């Protein structure tokens, strides 16, 4: 089975630990070569973040475990790239004509 190469997750997490700590923990997951975390909404006790992971890994279960371990929840899996090369998302005809 082909490896996952890129995964984008929408995650709700508490303010603590900070995203720098979460990024380091995710980067330690076997097969993860790079991590990008962006905060896009902050509430009183939690923050919503977009997590982008790149590398060559078989499944996202270890990633989910890290997120749950820090008290977070994966809201959605927003993008996945698998296979030998990266395929960029293309606009559909409807999107190009809007």
Kindly label every feature range from the protein language model.
Residues 1-98:
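Long, contiguous binding/interaction regions
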């Amino acid at each position: 089975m082909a490896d996952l190469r890129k995964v984008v997750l929408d995650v709700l997490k508490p303010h603590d630990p900070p995203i720098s700590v979460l990024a380091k923990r995710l980067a330690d997951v076997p097969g993860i070569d790079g991590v990008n975390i962006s905060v896009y909404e902050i509430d009183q006790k939690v923050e919503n973040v977009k997590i982008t992971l790149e590398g060559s890994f078989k499944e996202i279960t270890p990633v989910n475990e890290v997120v749950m371990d820090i008290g977070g929840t994966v809201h959605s899996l927003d993008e996945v790239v698998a296979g030998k090369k990266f395929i960029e998302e293309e606009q559909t005809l409807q999107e190009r004509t809007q």
